[in-house]
Amino acid sequence: MTLTYVFHSGFVLETEKSILIFDYWLDLNGVVPPFLKKDKPVYVFSSHFHEDHFNSDIFEWRKQREGITYILSKDIYKHRRASKEDADVWLAKGSTWSDGTLYVWALGSTDSGVSWIVETEGKRIFHAGDLNNWYARFLPEAEPGETIYSEEFDEDIDPIAHEKQYLGELKDIRKITDSFDVVMFPIDGRIGNGYTLGGRQLIERFKVGLFVPMHFVASGFESAWRMKEFTDEKSIPFWEITKEGETIEI
């Protein structure tokens, strides 16, 4: 089983029997086309409607081949980014789906859409989508019940409530499992101080076979490697991605 980095939060997981594509946005190095030519069923996941996690170009792949199953978050349809007939499966938080090859759980997010648990061929995979403790840098100055104005987000935010929501989502995930063979999770330096906090809180609560950073394209590959210090403390393997198209054995 291999995992290939496409771009941003996009990955291709190839198993013995199938190919899974997560959160395709851009493919600057032509990583995906060779996978579409393989004689295996393809499953395409999009966690939410944001343009950096969903690109309607994925539907063009149907013209190239048969055997593609589209598994999309319902918020994509709600925000009119796709028609109901575009996807084979629409899922919201709490929904599940299986075809005997894949077993899929749609979990919550602290932003839009869902995060994914996928079980296939004896492996349990987690793709976080936009689930994260996004306002971590505001926590040191936060007071319970009070909001802080963020120029970046142009809104009043409540970092303590947001963190509580995030930890609540992790608690919901633990009701299903406490371990993953692979975790793909946002390590985004744009958050500022504390940008690894969400990842650290996750590995404190779950056994992780391999931690894979994502959502770091704006701050660079090396910014994501900051998380390795914390995975090393727990003897969790960390994938130091260095380029698009890079592949790791799972």
Task: Spell out what each predicted region is.
Residues V6, G10-E51, S56-W61, L131-I176:
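Pre-active-site segment of Zn-dependent metallo-hydrolases
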Residues T2, S18-I19, Y103, S115, ...:
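Residues that mark the start of a beta-strand
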Residues L13-E16, D99, V118-E121:
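Active-site beta-strand termini and strand-to-loop segments that position acidic
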Residues I21-W25, K40-F54, Y70-D75, F126-D130, ...:
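Active-site neighborhood of phospho(di)ester-bond hydrolases with catalytic His/Asp-centered motifs
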Residues P33-W97:
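Active-site HxH/HxHxD metal-binding segment of metal-dependent hydrolases
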Residues T4-H8, R81-W97, R174, I191, ...:
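Binuclear metal-ion centers of metallo-dependent hydrolases, dominated by the metallo-beta-lactamase
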Residues D27-G30, F49-F54, Y77-R80, S95-W97, ...:
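Active-site environment of divalent metal-dependent phosphoester hydrolases
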Residues H8-G10, S112-S115:
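Short hydrophobic/aromatic beta-strand or adjacent loop that forms the aromatic wall/cage
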